[in-house]
């Protein structure tokens, strides 16, 4: 594909992604407040059906590569007595991690006394991360540094290959080739890359599961807003803010460079948790900001106008409450869009074009792992200590990514000097 095609496809993807956010968020919440969730899910299902039909009838893109095109791989440089045990160990580790998660899910669904999510994260969480991330990375490092594995051009398909050999080769290429290339190229810098992939979007990964309960609930310091409130503040202003944050991040990367923006993205992503903590604690700081900035009156007037369209009964202080929510969500989504562009640019920069698809998919999937595993633990803290405590915890945990981004910035500066 030409650069023009790639730019067009990227623009179409962003347009579709943001449009989906409006439909599944802003429009869906408005419909739910008026027609109920059944009608809302039917509407979303219809839109998804259109997407499925489009995917089915869309023509396959023409590929410039033949099915048997050569591919860079480390497998040929290793004896079978080394590669087979390596693949077996990692495959067993992934299987054990999957079974641990599956057992917890099944017990949560069907057990008379569901297991504690916090206990699961504290006891099994480190094992899952170790088996699925650390073990493959350590084995890859051993193959590179101890056995001297080198990347060579090998055919994508090998004639007269047995099924066992085919499975071994495909697993090796999917698991080890991307990691071994990173490790052989970056050396110890690969540790920083993996740690950043695991921690940079921790707050985003955690927050998604608790957003609606915090906005709509009335316990543990939740805000008790209506569906219309959330539709306007989160799914309209929030989406607009995400677009603006992404644009700001892209512009600053072009002006300042990748690593300064990456560092700042980690700071703002963590800092916006303090806004939510203040919101959960009564919004003293936010009220002061609205007063000093004179944003309170216009935002309150907008909220009062929107309240007239809502089928729900609104509180007397609806304008002030919505002003707080809109400012907080706008700031958080600006930071989220900014950080998303930063981490995307960073991950794109560290992958090898020959392994780009697999390496980027691997690193991008790691960005949500720690946050996903941390949700049950933080959910229990919400029930015992409230949302304020959780937002303070996520703020401090976000600082880990900030420290790691500084170390990575220094590493890259030394490598280029």
Feature names for model-found ranges:
Residues 110-122, 196, 200, 209-231:
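Short amphipathic helix-loop junctions that connect adjacent transmembrane helices
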Residues 32, 244-263, 382-383:
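Helix-to-loop junctions at the C-terminal end of transmembrane segments
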């Amino acid at each position: 594909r030409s650069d023009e095609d790639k730019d067009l496809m990227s623009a179409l993807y962003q347009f579709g992604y943001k449009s989906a956010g409006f439909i599944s968020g802003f429009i869906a919440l408005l419909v739910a407040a008026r027609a109920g969730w059944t009608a809302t899910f039917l509407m979303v299902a219809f839109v998804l059906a259109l997407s499925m039909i489009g995917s089915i009838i869309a023509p396959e893109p023409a590929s410039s590569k033949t099915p048997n095109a050569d591919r860079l791989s480390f497998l040929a440089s290793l004896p079978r007595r080394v590669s087979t045990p390596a693949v077996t160990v990692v495959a067993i580790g992934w299987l054990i991690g999957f079974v641990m998660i599956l057992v917890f899910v099944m017990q949560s669904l069907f057990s008379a006394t569901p297991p504690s999510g916090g206990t699961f994260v504290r006891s099994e969480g480190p094992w899952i991360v170790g088996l699925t991330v650390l073990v493959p990375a350590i084995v890859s490092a051993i193959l590179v540094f101890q056995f001297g594995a080198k990347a060579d051009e090998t055919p994508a398909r090998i004639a007269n290959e047995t099924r066992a050999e085919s499975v071994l080769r495909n697993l090796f290429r999917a698991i080890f080739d991307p990691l071994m290339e990173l490790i052989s190229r970056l050396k110890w810098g690969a540790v920083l890359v993996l740690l950043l992939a695991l921690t940079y979007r921790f707050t985003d990964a955690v927050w998604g599961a608790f957003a609606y309960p915090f906005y709509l609930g009335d316990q543990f310091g939740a805000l008790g807003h209506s569906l219309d409130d959330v539709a306007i503040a989160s799914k309209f202003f929030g989406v607009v803010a995400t677009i603006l944050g992404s644009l700001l991040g892209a512009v600053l990367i072009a002006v300042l460079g990748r690593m300064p923006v990456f560092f700042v993205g980690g700071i703002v992503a963590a800092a916006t948790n303090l806004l939510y903590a203040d919101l959960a604690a009564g919004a003293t700081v936010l009220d002061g900001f609205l007063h000093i900035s004179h944003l309170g009156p216009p935002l309150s007037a907008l909220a009062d106008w929107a309240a007239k369209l809502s089928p729900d009964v609104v509180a007397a202080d609806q304008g002030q409450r919505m002003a707080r929510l809109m400012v907080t969500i706008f700031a958080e989504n600006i930071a989220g869009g900014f950080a998303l562009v930063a981490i995307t640019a960073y991950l794109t920069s560290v992958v090898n074009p020959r392994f780009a698809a697999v390496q980027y998919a691997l690193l991008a999937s790691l960005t949500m792992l720690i946050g996903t595993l941390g949700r049950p633990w933080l959910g229990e803290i919400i029930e015992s200590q409230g949302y304020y405590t959780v937002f303070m915890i996520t703020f401090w945990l976000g600082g880990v990514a900030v420290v790691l981004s500084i170390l990575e910035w220094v590493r890259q500066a030394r490598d280029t000097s």
